[in-house]
């Protein structure tokens, strides 16, 4: 009886495997400022896009500066993102205005590079899903406003899961911007 051959994976097959009969989900690399942004991105992918996107997150800490986000997404794209359809930086304006030039340079490097900036914070974007509100609110007031309007019967907590009803109201927020 002959010995069975052991299967060795070549370097080319490492990484994302293609299931037979199916195409790969498009890979999108994200660098997010905080836990709330990461949770929101995952909720969007699940509830709005039906898990048709494969997200990959750059290793960032909560409250990352824009400089750190640009640096981390560049590293992630070099390591894992050569086949990525897009790369997104998601952050707030409240503490990032001074690093804007770096972001603009990164955006010019590739058509695959994108940015989503919320002003003053991502919670303002959440409020727009459920009501029209003043643009002049600061981050602290926005969080109080959101707490009153939070869907799902609970109060809002940074980094907590995002209710599907909020994601389903995305078109409302887009119209109110």
Q: Whereabouts are the PLM-identified features?
A:
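Phosphate/oxyanion-binding active-site loops and adjacent basic polyanion-contact surfaces
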Residues: 37, 62-70
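Helix N-cap/beta->alpha junction signal
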Residues: 32-34
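C-terminal accessory helical subdomains adjacent to catalytic cores in phosphodiester-
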Residues: 2-27, 38-60, 74-88, 93-177
């Amino acid at each position: 009886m002959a010995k069975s051959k052991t299967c060795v994976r070549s370097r080319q097959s490492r990484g994302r495997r293609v299931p037979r009969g199916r195409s790969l989900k498009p890979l999108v690399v994200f660098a997010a400022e905080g836990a709330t942004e990461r949770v929101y991105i995952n909720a969007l992918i699940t509830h709005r896009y039906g898990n048709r996107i494969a997200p990959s997150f750059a290793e960032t800490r909560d409250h990352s500066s824009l400089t750190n986000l640009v640096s981390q997404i560049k590293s992630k794209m070099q390591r894992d993102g050569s086949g990525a359809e897009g790369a997104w930086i998601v952050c707030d304006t409240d503490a990032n205005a001074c690093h804007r030039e770096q972001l603009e340079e990164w955006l010019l490097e590739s058509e695959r590079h994108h940015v989503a900036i919320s002003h003053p914070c991502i919670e303002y974007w959440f409020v727009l899903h459920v009501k029209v509100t003043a643009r002049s609110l600061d981050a602290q007031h926005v969080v109080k406003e959101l707490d009153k309007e939070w869907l799902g019967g609970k109060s809002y907590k940074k980094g907590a899961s995002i209710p599907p009803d909020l994601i389903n109201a995305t078109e409302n927020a887009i119209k109110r911007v």
